């Protein structure tokens, strides 16, 4: 966890990697809440995740009524995080098609989201960053490109070493729920 926090403090994106059941989503949610005060800026990766889900969409009624403008842009969670200087969570990054994954490369390198239709762009506010999760041994995953991997610090979350350790983790988690 210390490495994850240090990564985000140095303005580098974080990739939490591990097999299913290693609490990647739980860790990303709690890091985002602790650092940004908001863990709800989330893109859920699936095989059907489109580039618009990451970048922005259009309010077609507004587009038809007033033409192309920033008022017709429907910001994605990524765009909202950039505008507000918060962390955005990308769940299941490796389930997103490879060609869509590549849209993160310029976001992470330049911290800029172009809107070419308007000849505009969104510059990330201070504090913006990405926490992504990925399964490394699951079916239906797309390999990350080396260019994208280079833009993340990768933290591998291991499985518990024993049944006893797993029971202890569950007991601790259940006890903490009672205090919330």
PLM segments and residue spans:
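AAA+ P-loop NTPase catalytic core and its hallmark functional loops
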Residues: 1-179
């Amino acid at each position: 966890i210390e490495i994850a926090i240090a990564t985000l403090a140095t303005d580098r994106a974080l990739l939490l990697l591990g097999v299913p059941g290693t609490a990647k989503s739980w860790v990303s949610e709690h890091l985002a809440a602790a650092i940004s005060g908001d863990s709800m800026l989330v893109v859920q990766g699936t095989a059907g995740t489109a580039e618009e889900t990451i970048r922005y969409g259009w309010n077609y009624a507004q587009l038809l009524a007033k033409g192309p403008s920033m008022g017709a842009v429907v910001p994605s969670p990524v765009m909202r995080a950039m505008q507000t200087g918060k962390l955005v969570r990308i769940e299941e990054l490796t389930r997103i098609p490879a060609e869509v994954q590549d849209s993160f490369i310029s976001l992470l390198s330049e911290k800029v989201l172009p809107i070419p239709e308007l000849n505009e762009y969104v510059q990330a506010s201070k504090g913006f960053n990405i926490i992504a999760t990925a399964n490394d041994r699951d079916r239906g995953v797309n390999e990350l490109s080396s260019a994208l991997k280079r833009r993340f610090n990768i933290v591998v979350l291991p499985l518990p070493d024993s049944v006893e350790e797993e029971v202890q983790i569950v007991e601790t988690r259940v006890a903490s729920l009672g205090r919330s």
